[in-house]
Amino acid sequence: MSKEFEAFKKTLSPQSLKAIYDETRLEIADDHAEGTEAFSVAMASQMAINIVEAYQRWLAEQEE
C-alpha cells in the first residue's frame, strides 16, 4: 500500500468510522430494509465508496 494510504488509515478513529457508518446508513435507508441481504450488500458497497471519498478529501487537504 502507498505511504499516503497508510498515513490516512492512522487518522481513522472509531469515531470517524462511526460517522462514516452513520452517513452510509442514512444514504441507503430509503432503498433497503435493514437486516436484509440487500441492505448488507448496499451498506458494504456504500461504506467502501464513502471511505474512498474520505481518503480523497484527506489527500486534497494534504496537498494544501
Residue map of PLM features:
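N-terminal acidic leader/helix
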Residues: 1-35
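Short, charge-rich amphipathic interface segments used for partner binding and complex assembly
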Residues: 26-64
